[in-house]
Amino acid sequence: MRNEPLTGYLLHHKPYKESRALYYFFTQTHGVVHGVGKKGMPLFAHIQLFASGKRSLKTFTQIQPLTPQVAITGQNLYAGFYLNELLWKLLASEDAMPVLWQNYQHSLTTLREPLNGVQLRLLLRFFEQALFTELGYAITLDTDSQGEPIKQEQDYRFIADEGFVNYIAAQKSEPTEFAASSIFLGKWLQQIDDYLQTHQEQVYSLKNHDKAIQADTLKVWSGLHKLMIDHLFDYQPLQSRALWQQQARYR
């Protein structure tokens, strides 16, 4: 790159020198770009800057917001930290993902609005689903690992690299103790899939979504996604998740 204009969002920053910082900048055209620039780039703001450099670490100059910044507050702020951590830790450098970038931009817009607890969890599940798809880990909810339709009264074990494995068949071939959190009843998977089939096109409009999904279904969906996130992070703790849980205890 040679003084190339980039627009996007700051995902993360680290101290670099007295007046400079190392930035992880998420762009629509180049994915996550690593660069060094003057300290002070704000999170969650739509930003334009100029990037130069042939190596993986660029030099960022002329950093400026493109639109007035509307603050993200409360629980929504911690959700924003979580989205950022997923992206800067999981995405490869300079690998464009324009669909995921648009999803992230819309998610930030929604996080600037008042959301109840159910709407906030739904926003996160939709975003995680888009991320899994981009990373090649899309979760198939209507068939098991052998391509057979999910059965309502059947138990399945979720394995990130395989999908849903028939629990009874797996136990017969290789009896093993599994964590209860990895076992899912088919009817819950069907309910999640039915919800997605109905509401996928309305992902950016969460109004009345909280009335369209049962609390138990959302809880199961959240547990399923947590298994995938833990797998992708090799079971290392997420800083944003710990921060969110910590502040929740002191509210």
How would you describe each model-predicted region?
Residues 1-18, 26-251:
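Non-catalytic alpha-helical scaffolds and adjoining flexible linkers that form interface surfaces
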Residues 22:
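Histidine-centered divalent-metal-coordination microenvironment in nucleic-acid enzymes
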